[in-house]
Amino acid sequence: MWGRDYELKYISYPKSVAIIGASKTEGKVGYAIMKNLKDFNGKIYPINPKYDEIFGIKCYKSVLDVEDDIDLAVIVVPNIVVPKVLEECGKKGVKGAVIITAGFSEVGNYELENKIKEIAKRYNIRIIGPNCLGIMNTHINLNATFAKVFPPKGGVSIISQSGAVLNAILDIAPLLNIGFSKVVSIGNKADIQESDLLEYFLDDEDTKIVVLYIEGLKDKRFLKVAKKLSKKKPIIALKSGRTEVGKKAAKSHTGSLAGEDVIYEAAFKEAGIIRAYTFEELVDLIHLFSTQPTISSNEIGIITNAGGFGVLAADSCVDYNMKLSNFEKSTIEKLKNILPPTANISNPLDIIGDATPERYKKVIEVLAEDSNVKGLLVILTPQEMTKPLEVAKSIIEVKNSHKEFKNKPLITSFVGGVSVKGAKSYLRKNGIPAYITPENGVKALSHLYKYSLMKVKEDYDEYLENIKEEFIKITEENKEIIKELLSNPNEYTAKKLLSIYGLPVPKGYLAKNEDEALEYCKKLGKCVMKIVSPQIIHKTEAGGVIINPKNPKEAFKKLIENAKEYAKRMGIDNLIIEGVLVEEFIEKDMMEIIIGAKRDDIFGSVVMVGLGGVFVEVLKDVSFGISPITRDFAHEMLRELKSYKVLEGVRGRPKRDINFIVDTLIKIGVFMDIHKEIKELDLNPVFVFNEKEGGCIGDARIIK
């Protein structure tokens, strides 16, 4: 964080570690860390003026007394002493520090935390923490934590804001035979952020999978770095606090719908991060990605000894965008020779309730060799003739003896409790995920498929880049008028501003009196009249819209009266009425949607699309993306909508102009990226015409 030329190797691969606050007293953190470092491949230097030695290792009064170079300092002294020892580390030339000590910003002690940040910056020391569990690197036997468990060596690197969550994962890992590479508890993140570590893991050969436990992000670089890393290595994240923080303060439709969690959801989706929603799912995903290959096709085979669960799994294929493979002819012939005559050879493949371990084994072997089957789900239910543990052993045997499973995931669902407990444990320990339900098995395969799609997704979009260039030029050429329009944002000025950037809006005028209203209505022919007031957000509720008025003068007066009555009813003091917007009436076959945007402190411009008009906050059929938005991602956003089929045309209804929506989403994202003074933007409704006919922004609201 202090500079862009830094390296984290002195923290992750130190050759020497000083433990400042090392202790001989059992139960103290300094004792636990000394004990955990006993097998470290490098040199250890205990620092504590009370002792001459600890565990038979010479103890020093200060890091300044150590003759050798020190790469990493682990600090476990009281919080008020931390600045002093960190200063000494700086003078000694220590490259990195892990500050275990608590009592900083997490308890409101920002002054003390700022002090250590200033010292670290002055001496160019990289800091992890404060208020953290510590760090591990299994590849050099580095356990600079006070955790009880040191996990097996492997390819999973984990970054966590919670020491407790980290401890729980480490405790579970041996049961699942999950191997770890780097383990980092980042605590308060005074210096090193998630993005710093993600950037480091990009080229770390020992890291194959990255796991995140996030409570909140501070660093705006996170999205960019995560997007780059996820192309090479899976990133799995669990985000706690899934509540819509700040929703009450939101002033627009977009603001009220774009709570904290939906923004994180959009960011993870755009960065290619695989999101876990529960701790259990996080552990399952770690096990899945550390044991199974990804698949480039969504065609899977399902084996079951119970027809009902096969049907449930097939239903889940629809839910998770997976397909049932068509077995090759040679596969069908082989299966006929293996299965009883009563077996129906189709997918899902019901191998009958009396299926033996040998039958399971032979069927799995056949489907392993079928090139149409890209992934395999094996379901077992405990029946009188079933031997779950023996079946589990046969599955492991097939997996280990068939090279096809290097590129073909093999997932199991042993449905039951007591009868299958041992078998599931055996499968997991031997690298086969075992789920309690078939639905979760299908979902697991879908994760492997979605990740493979994300890896090959093209991030560069020439159209997007052209829009960026065009909008920058427009902004420069229209500086003064844009500044004037943004000085008093209302529907009229918002639409004028959007039209400068080529976004389609109805022709309209702002009437200040009855005579102007009449004049403008005559100009436009069939028209719509709308009240313009910064205090009236929902015009329909206020009686602030009149369509095709017979008497524009009377309509003008009526809109003013309605606005005043609404203000009185809602307790609005000092009502400001800026006039009445008179616009052309759009007479086309159309569908209403909403497009909006919100400024987020971490992720920047968040763009929203959904079913529009008055129903947006009732149905909440919306999707979010982080700008800049590519055409592919804009299409993904639309496909997430439950109402997407309506856009495509159903039951005789015409197909709408989806390309117009995609184009508008891209442009609104770029518009928001340029105008950082805008906090929220609502385009509701946006009229979408029939295919290739475009659309038009019906209403616009800008909040600065």
Swiss-Prot record:
Keyword Nucleotide-binding (UniProt): yes
Keywords from the named record: ATP-binding, Ligase, Nucleotide-binding
Enzyme class: ligase
GO terms for MF: acetate-CoA ligase (ADP-forming) activity; ATP binding
Record note on quaternary structure: Homodimer.
One family name in Pfam for this protein: ATP-grasp_5
Matches recorded under PANTHER family: ACETATE--COA LIGASE [ADP-FORMING]
Family that this chain belongs to: In the N-terminal section; belongs to the acetate CoA ligase alpha subunit family. In the C-terminal section; belongs to the acetate CoA ligase beta subunit family.
Catalyzed reactions: acetate + ATP + CoA = acetyl-CoA + ADP + phosphate
Domain of life: Archaea
InterPro entries: AcCoA-synth-alpha (IPR014089), Acyl-CoA_Synth/Transferase (IPR051538), ATP_grasp_subdomain_1 (IPR013815), CoA-bd (IPR003781), Ligase_CoA_dom (IPR043938), NAD(P)-bd_dom_sf (IPR036291), Succ_CoA_lig_flav_dom (IPR032875), Succinyl-CoA_synth-like (IPR016102)
Cross-referenced NCBIfam families: AcCoA-syn-alpha
Listed name of the protein: Acetate--CoA ligase [ADP-forming]
EC number of this enzyme: 6.2.1.13
Function comment: Catalyzes the formation of acetate and ATP from acetyl-CoA by using ADP and phosphate. Can also use butyryl-CoA, but not phenylacetyl-CoA. Cannot catalyze the reverse reaction.
